[in-house]
């Protein structure tokens, strides 16, 4: 696999080729995922839950994100590396720039921000200064207490229209990629068709331009609750390398996610 760039992902959308993404937090797994063909590695603030044992992502610091980004960058040769901007690290355009600068210096090639049109000024500020941005709409885990828990978003008409509107606004502000999390299949398909940029889904059905999973979910490393949208690829293969190859294959073929992993 040649080196993946934002231009590569855009061409994949245009050519109707599915994008495979997965979270990574260290050099060893980053190399494994990179070697087996994952296109995108996300250093997710999900590390606050799957590595640190927290109930949400809110306590993750910029320093921790920088550390894990540096680790992943050392292990990956070809995949596009995206780093999450942690909670309350992008409240103003200037703070956003300072956080993004640290993550990019650590090896990220794009930063991800959760939220809607209120981020547009910060997105423009970053893109003007050479920082590619990934948006994130639907279930945004940093807003878990606003939502009242980890719940599917966009099921009523008003909420669906608002997510659609915000997706268009973020695109016009300059994002080059969008993550859609836990939204109904029909809404995800509508947004994917409307946007010029690639849309990566998690719990958003098969119509998006690609899929992302938390690596622990893909390997069945869970502590009780298993989200509907996940699949244990390790259980089917018994080998981590084979598990990631199967994940990449099923995303590429469009067989994952299936109806049992999606919301209506």
Curated annotation (Swiss-Prot):
Keywords for the protein's UniProt record, in alphabetical order: Cytoplasm, Magnesium, Metal-binding, Pantothenate biosynthesis, Transferase
Cofactor: Mg(2+)
GO molecular function: 3-methyl-2-oxobutanoate hydroxymethyltransferase activity; magnesium ion binding
Binding site for 3-methyl-2-oxobutanoate: 45-46, 84, 112
UniProt-annotated binding residues for Mg(2+): 45, 84, 114
Class of enzymatic activity (EC top level): transferase
Recorded metabolic or biological pathway in which this protein acts: Cofactor biosynthesis; (R)-pantothenate biosynthesis; (R)-pantoate from 3-methyl-2-oxobutanoate: step 1/2
Any one Gene Ontology BP term: pantothenate biosynthetic process
The protein's Enzyme Commission number: 2.1.2.11
Active site: 181 (proton acceptor)
Cited Gene3D superfamilies: Phosphoenolpyruvate-binding domains
Keyword Cell inner membrane carried by entry: no
CDD domains with a match to the protein in the record: KPHMT-like
Cofactor-binding details, from the entry: Binds 1 Mg(2+) ion per subunit.
Record's GO cellular component terms: cytoplasm
Subcellular location: Cytoplasm
Record's catalysed reaction(s): 3-methyl-2-oxobutanoate + (6R)-5,10-methylene-5,6,7,8-tetrahydrofolate + H2O = 2-dehydropantoate + (6S)-5,6,7,8-tetrahydrofolate
Alphabetical list of InterPro entries matching this protein: Pantoate_hydroxy_MeTrfase, Pyrv/PenolPyrv_kinase-like_dom, Pyrv_kinase-like_dom_sf
Family of the protein in this entry: Belongs to the PanB family.
Quaternary data: Homodecamer; pentamer of dimers.
Free-text function comment from the UniProt entry: Catalyzes the reversible reaction in which hydroxymethyl group from 5,10-methylenetetrahydrofolate is transferred onto alpha-ketoisovalerate to form ketopantoate.
PANTHER family reported in the protein's UniProt record: 3-METHYL-2-OXOBUTANOATE HYDROXYMETHYLTRANSFERASE
Official protein name in the record: 3-methyl-2-oxobutanoate hydroxymethyltransferase
């Amino acid at each position: 696999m040649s080196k993946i760039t934002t231009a590569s992902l855009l061409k994949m959308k245009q050519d109707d080729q599915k994008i495979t993404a997965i979270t990574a937090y260290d050099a060893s797994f980053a190399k494994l995922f990179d070697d087996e063909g994952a296109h995108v590695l996300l250093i997710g603030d999900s590390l606050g839950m799957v590595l640190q044992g927290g109930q949400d992502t809110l306590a993750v610091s910029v320093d921790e994100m920088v550390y894990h980004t540096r680790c992943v960058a050392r292990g990956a040769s070809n995949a596009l590396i995206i780093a999450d901007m942690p909670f309350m690290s992008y409240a103003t355009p200037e703070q956003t720039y300072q956080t993004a600068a640290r993550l990019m210096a650590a090896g990220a090639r794009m930063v991800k921000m959760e939220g809607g049109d209120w981020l547009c000024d910060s997105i423009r500020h970053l893109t003007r200064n050479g920082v590619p941005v990934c948006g994130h709409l639907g279930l945004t885990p940093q807003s878990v207490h606003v939502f009242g828990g980890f719940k599917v978003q966009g099921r009523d008409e008003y909420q669906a229209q608002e997510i659609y509107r915000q997706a268009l606004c973020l695109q016009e502000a300059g994002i080059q990629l969008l993550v859609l999390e836990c939204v109904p299949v029909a809404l995800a398909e509508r947004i994917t068709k409307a946007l010029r940029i690639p849309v990566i889904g998690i719990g958003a059905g098969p119509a998006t331009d690609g899929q992302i999973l938390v690596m622990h979910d893909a390997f069945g490393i869970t502590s009780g609750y298993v989200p509907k949208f996940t699949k244990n690829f390790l259980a089917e293969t018994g080998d981590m390398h084979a598990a990631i190859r199967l994940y990449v294959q099923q995303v590429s073929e469009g067989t994952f996610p299936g109806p049992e992993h999606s919301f209506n």
